[in-house]
Amino acid sequence: MEHAATLPQTSRRPATPLTGTITVPGDKSISHRALMFAGLAVGETRISGLLEGEDVLRTAAAMRALGATVERTGPGAWRASGPGIGGLQSPDDVLDMGNSGTAARLLCGILASHDIFAVMTGDASLRRRPMRRVIDPLGATGAVFAAREGGRLPLSVRGAAEAMPLSYRLPVASAQVKSALLLAGLNARGITEIEEPEPTRDHSENMLRHFGAEVEVAAHGTGKLIRLRGQPELRGADVVVPGDPSSAAFPIVAALIVPGSRVTIGGVGLNPLRTGLFLTLREMGAAIEIVNAREAGGEPVGDLIVTASDLRAVDVPAERAPSMIDEYPILAVACAMARGSSRLRGLAELRVKESDRLAATLAMITANGVKAQVDGDDLIIEGGGARGGATVATHMDHRLAMSALVMGLATETPVTIDDARFIDTSFPGFLPLMRGIGAAIEAAA
């Protein structure tokens, strides 16, 4: 879906501290996977807390087009069932994945090992993103992909009639590539083995077990070795989706940098492979308290109490990147407001996000008066506050848009973004939620 009119927004220092108790939308990674696994399983799955952003709705539509039953039964409540492993059908029309790189890459894995033909496209942003690192290893299943230069969408896939299991070492740690290969392995006879150089988010492995697949995970050097037995009988299993820690990052940093603020965020997912930002912010002196720790749907969950804090600079090691890969733009905002010089290491992966997120993050903070530079794959930020006053080009990147609006809550003069429409891809309701705790965000004049 291509969007029409833009939606510029401006944020400024609020007159009073941010306060209140909120919840953030369901975890995007888990929501995508819940719909996909439910659409492959025999029997009904009931999903609660599903993120109903544009990206996840694309996954729901794609699974319907492939023959699964997927329907909404209430706010965040969905019901899905599938034909079983190997039972998907060729879609009647092109699969449009909108802005969702996660949906597109994971779906390539499903399509590769099913004897079906499909064509996939996306919006202008997604069509610029490289898919080669997913479709190249998937070719070893016997699937045939045809794509534009660089493996970019639109692409077609003729899935393998008899898919071969994969044995593959990821050259770069990537939960999306790993998950695509595991999804392909579901309909391959034999054992699929994937070696990752660093641990990445393990929602796919957790959900595979939840739906009845046989998956083994073992430490392997600095990373992990995952082994999946193909062609299991997946059975429907209810899923509770926790609040997305990547979405919680925005009100968390806002509460930290607006003096006097205190905000509680309920039901946030605390998977240890997703909480690198929380660890980093605590190293910076952030007052983030976890209370009511519990488990929901096989994932650790807790409530976060965040209090405004005097932040100090931090040196973030490259090996932490997989656990916070989506949070670097908002971390850059926190570093800009901190005392001292911060260095965020090993950010090459940001260059192939919705935008060149490394270059765009640098442009966002420097345009607003922050001294910063890219050194190789590292981002160096001189803290001490930001002047503000700039209009930030969001490049159709939802996380960049939200980060810039949070930054404007603590700058000397307001910050404007050129377009807030794409925020709904991951965080529907972001603007009213932030206004509800006292954030001064309004339509740009």
Curated annotation (Swiss-Prot):
What cellular component terms from Gene Ontology apply here?
A: cytoplasm
In terms of CDD domains, this protein maps to: EPSP_synthase (cd01556)
Q: Quick one: where's region Disordered?
A: 1-24
Q: Which UniProt keywords apply?
A: Amino-acid biosynthesis, Aromatic amino acid biosynthesis, Cytoplasm, Transferase
One example GO MF annotation = 3-phosphoshikimate 1-carboxyvinyltransferase activity
Which residues are noted in the entry as 3-phosphoshikimate-binding?
28-29, 33, 174, 176, 326, 353
Q: In which pathway does it act?
A: Metabolic intermediate biosynthesis; chorismate biosynthesis; chorismate from D-erythrose 4-phosphate and phosphoenolpyruvate: step 6/7
List its EC numbers: 2.5.1.19
Cited Gene3D superfamilies = Enolpyruvate transferase domain (3.65.10.10)
Which residues carry out catalysis?
A: 326
| Chemical reaction(s) catalysed | 3-phosphoshikimate + phosphoenolpyruvate = 5-O-(1-carboxyvinyl)-3-phosphoshikimate + phosphate
Q: Give the Pfam families listed for this entry.
A: EPSP_synthase
Q: Name one GO biological process term.
A: chorismate biosynthetic process
Q: At which positions is phosphoenolpyruvate bound? A: 28, 101, 129, 176, 357, 399
Subcellular location(s): the record lists: Cytoplasm
Question: Which PROSITE patterns has this protein been placed in?
Answer: EPSP_SYNTHASE_1, EPSP_SYNTHASE_2
Q: Where is the composition biased (Polar residues)?
A: 7-22
In terms of SUPFAM superfamilies, this protein maps to: EPT/RTPC-like
* UniProt family annotation: Belongs to the EPSP synthase family.
Q: Extract the NCBIfam families matched here.
A: aroA (TIGR01356)
| Its biological purpose | Catalyzes the transfer of the enolpyruvyl moiety of phosphoenolpyruvate (PEP) to the 5-hydroxyl of shikimate-3-phosphate (S3P) to produce enolpyruvyl shikimate-3-phosphate and inorganic phosphate.
Q: How does it assemble?
A: Monomer.
Q: State the name under which the record lists this protein.
A: 3-phosphoshikimate 1-carboxyvinyltransferase
Q: What is the lineage of its organism?
A: Bacteria, Pseudomonadati, Pseudomonadota, Alphaproteobacteria, Acetobacterales
